Amino acid sequence: FSTMQMMSKADVLDKFRPDEFDFICIDETHRAGAESYQRILEYFKPQFLLGMTASPERTDNFDIFDLYDYNIAYEIRLQQALEENLLCPFHYFGITDLEIDGETFDDESGLRNFVKLVSDERVDYILKQVEYFGYSGDRVKGLVFCSRKDEGEELARKFCQRGYRARMLSGDDSQAVREEVIDRLVSDTREDYLDYVFTVDIFNEGVDIPEVNQVVMLRPTQSPIVFVQQLGRGLRKSDDKEFVVILDFIGNYKNNFMIPIALSGDRSYNKDTMRRYVSEGARVIPGSSTIHFDEISKKRIYQAIDSASTNDLRTLKEAYSNLKQKLGRIPKLKDFYDYGTIDVTKFFDKLGSYHEFLKKYEADYTTELSEKEEAILQFISRKLAK
């Protein structure tokens, strides 16, 4: 066993022959595009190379599937993992974030208004909710995700003023400090234990804290990937908890439509499917997990769904690139359905046909159609999209 940081050092690599190991397992392999990972992967020549990741969909266009000859040995998503009882059940509550002076937190002003983000009124409101919805176990062991470092620092300070033990962790803290703070959070014997750890994004991935029994989200949803990563910090099973409580404080953000996408695992970006999940998610979530949105949160999510552009080129290109990397070839229309990714009619709506998308954005696509054939294809595609 070795950490990536240790093994990527030249003097450490030199201690091993390229064929030293028959089997190598790379954890967090979605990071394999980084120079340090590449140094390791290019040096060793094992007989069998296995990669593991909880984030196979990338936004940086690096093809991790190519490293493994597009051979996916096993894949399991959140919904299936819950069905098979591999994860701790969760109770998700979408809670309306506080209005201050008649104003809601939104994309235009909310995240920039530091005074309102950390106001006593908001802190008291947050604490009222975390105390009301509670946790499983003898004491709370919570992670709080914020939008900004200074917000997390000030909120942690104000939690402490109100009798809670809290600490902010950021990317500026060393690995030793992070490990010490996590130990204080999970320990039941230390006198300097912590109730809450605030952070921005250093716990999105690669951190295993099974004891966490409450996750508080005080930031807008950046993407379905990040949402599931942060939700997942509480989904590891532990003898000390029966379930984890997820509290999502929902402002008036344009990305709110991503919440049902993340929770459902449905990547079709179909607006009717999103709306249905907001109203019926509690019925269809597997096992003993539950999902609940208060009425104002529902309204905000519906508004975000209505105004969302779900067939913009960035979304289409990202969905296409992820599927192409997984398959190792240009996807067929049926592949999008088989692999549960974006609704193909989004391509029809945006560009008239999938052929037109490939012609413009896929360098390896060589199929040519006559003007008449293209017109017929676009006519049929647009009819299907309606």
PLM regions: where:
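Long, largely alpha-helical accessory region at the distal end of helicase-like NTP-driven motors
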Residues: E131-Y132, S136-G137, I259-A385
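Post-DEXD/H (motif II) to motif III coupling segment of the RecA-like Helicase ATP-binding lobe
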Residues: H30-Y92
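Conserved helicase ATPase core of P-loop NTP-dependent helicases/translocases
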Residues: V12, E153-L155, Y164-F203
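A short beta-strand element within the Helicase C-terminal
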Residues: D195-P220, V226-Q229, R233, V244-D248
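Conserved RecA-like ASCE P-loop NTPase motor core of nucleic-acid helicases/translocases
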Residues: V140-R148, L169
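Conserved segment of the helicase C-terminal RecA-like domain
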Residues: P224-Q229, R233-S264
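Conserved interdomain linker/interface between the two RecA-like ATPase lobes of SF2 helicase motors
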Residues: I72-L143
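Conserved helix/coil segment N-terminal to the catalytic DExD/H
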Residues: S2-F23, A34-R39
